[in-house]
């Protein structure tokens, strides 16, 4: 490789077209470069360039310590401290105005004698952008929140009915704060996976994060293997203080990405368990709600859920979180009541439908999105309202079965809505 190629910066790579990037990738011997998206290809080139000079290329999520230095935590290690962490010096943090949660990529060196960690010697990119972009960022708390105005299209395979139903009855916009109200065994995890894959297929530039709190380890493996998303997990066998750390660093990472104008989606399973974990970790305030919930423990989960917003200045943070109901636990009931009404979209799952093995077990009448008129065009909106009026005259089971039968006869929601025109006269 020529000396000139060794010094290509991320800014220069971003300004190149895909054909030029392919030529560089070919000369560097990068495998399967034609199947990569542009951003992934740029980072593969940076990595290959760095390694050809005898150094390493490293990346991680920055956690700054009170003493002023920081470490890059690996997503593969669920953002927890490990021996593979990369040291960032206080001077680098000050020079580039870095914050906890920034994703840092750059040239790293091996630990010297007496050192324990790899160290960053040159920062190449901050949040997948050239380092100069840090000067244009607006702090997350100073961004103006707005209603979601641009819809995520989730519909993919005609046979995946859950995403088709969500698109019609509870559309998700960029910046939505959504809650999936789920009794046990109603299929919430399957719906989360289908939402993640729907966004991945139709909106590939969106950064998708699935955050699993207090879940079973085998479920974590299943979600990792079946979704196209970043999966960060704090399973039930992890100490509560570490689970809290994972959740907080994940939120900081998402906020930093929004500051850089990315559309970020966090799928949280589950908000109830996150609140339970905080209830263990937070120092007692001396007051107790029914079920043993400390009111002080609910502040941080509310802060997490409340971070979801569309912003007028650019990026958006969408959070779709599951809330557990009908578990037999008074604590879960209190947590759900505290969060009820804080979201602007609700998807309600039904235990009765799930018991009869009618999936997706969605209660269509109780599910919906606030200000859906900002997300759906007028024609679609009228037809969805007509469907709701039809469903109100039927039982929960009859309504869902009718809609699922009609969806199975059509290959897309567009075709399904045209079918309504033909049958309108009958109702």
Swiss-Prot record:
This protein's source sits in the domain of life called Bacteria
Please state what class of enzyme this protein is.
hydrolase
Q: Which cysteines are joined by disulfide bonds?
A: none
Name the gene. Answer: rho
Question: An example of a Gene Ontology BP annotation on this entry?
Answer: DNA-templated transcription termination
Q: Which UniProt keywords apply?
A: ATP-binding, Helicase, Hydrolase, Nucleotide-binding, RNA-binding, Transcription, Transcription regulation, Transcription termination
Q: What interactions and quaternary structure are annotated?
A: Homohexamer. The homohexamer assembles into an open ring structure.
Read off the NCBIfam families from this record: PRK09376.1 (NF006886), rho (TIGR00767)
Chain sites annotated for binding ATP:
173-178, 185-190, 216
Report the function annotation for this chain: Facilitates transcription termination by a mechanism that involves Rho binding to the nascent RNA, activation of Rho's RNA-dependent ATPase activity, and release of the mRNA from the DNA template.
Q: What is its EC number?
A: 3.6.4.-
In terms of Pfam families, this protein maps to:
ATP-synt_ab, Rho_N, Rho_RNA_bind
**Family matches, as InterPro entries:** AAA+_ATPase, ATPase_F1/V1/A1_a/bsu_nucl-bd, CSD, NA-bd_OB-fold, P-loop_NTPase, Rho-like_N, Rho_factor_ATP-bd, Rho_N_sf
Q: Which residues form the signal peptide?
A: none
Give the protein family: Belongs to the Rho family.
Single GO MF annotation: RNA binding
Q: Where is the Rho RNA-BD domain?
A: 55-130
What is this protein identified as?
A: Transcription termination factor Rho
């Amino acid at each position: 490789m020529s000396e000139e190629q060794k010094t290509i910066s991320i800014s220069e790579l971003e300004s190149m077209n895909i054909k030029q990037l392919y030529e560089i990738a070919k000369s560097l011997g990068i495998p399967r470069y034609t199947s990569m998206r542009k951003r992934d290809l740029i980072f593969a080139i940076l990595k290959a360039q760095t390694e050809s000079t005898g150094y390493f290329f490293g990346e991680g999520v920055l956690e700054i310590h009170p003493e002023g230095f920081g470490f890059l935590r690996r997503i593969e290690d669920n953002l927890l401290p490990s021996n593979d962490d990369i040291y960032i010096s206080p001077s680098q943090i000050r020079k580039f105005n870095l914050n906890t949660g920034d994703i840092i990529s750059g040239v790293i060196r091996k630990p010297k004698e007496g050192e324990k960690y790899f160290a960053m010697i040159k920062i190449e990119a901050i949040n997948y952008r050239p380092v100069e972009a840090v000067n244009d960022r607006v702090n997350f708390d100073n961004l103006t929140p707005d209603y979601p105005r641009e819809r995520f299209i989730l519909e993919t395979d005609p046979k995946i009915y859950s995403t088709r139903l969500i698109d019609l009855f509870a559309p998700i916009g960029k910046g939505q704060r959504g809650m999936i109200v789920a009794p046990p065994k109603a299929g919430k995890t399957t719906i989360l996976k289908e939402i993640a894959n729907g966004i991945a297929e139709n909106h590939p530039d969106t950064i998708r994060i699935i955050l699993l709190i207090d879940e079973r380890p085998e479920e974590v493996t299943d979600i990792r293997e079946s979704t196209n998303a970043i999966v960060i997990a704090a399973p039930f066998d992890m100490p509560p203080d570490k689970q809290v750390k994972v959740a907080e660093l994940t939120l900081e990472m998402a906020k930093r990405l929004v500051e850089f104008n990315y559309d970020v989606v966090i799928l949280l399973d589950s908000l109830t368990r996150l609140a339970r974990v905080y209830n263990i970790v937070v120092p007692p305030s001396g007051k107790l709600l029914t079920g043993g919930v400390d009111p002080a423990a609910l502040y941080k989960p509310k802060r997490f859920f409340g971070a979801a917003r569309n912003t007028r200045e650019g990026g958006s943070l969408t959070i779709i979180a599951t809330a557990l109901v009908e578990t037999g636990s008074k604590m879960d009931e209190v947590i759900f009541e505290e969060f009820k009404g804080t979201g602007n979209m609700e998807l309600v799952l039904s235990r009765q439908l799930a018991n009869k093995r009618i999936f997706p077990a969605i209660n269509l009448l109780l599910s919906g999105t606030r200000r859906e008129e900002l997300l759906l065009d007028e024609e679609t909106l009228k037809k969805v309202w007509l469907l709701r009026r039809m469903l109100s005259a039927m039982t929960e089971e009859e309504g869902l079965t009718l809609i699922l039968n009609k969806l199975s006869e059509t290959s897309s929601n567009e075709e399904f809505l045209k079918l309504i025109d033909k049958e309108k006269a009958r109702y």
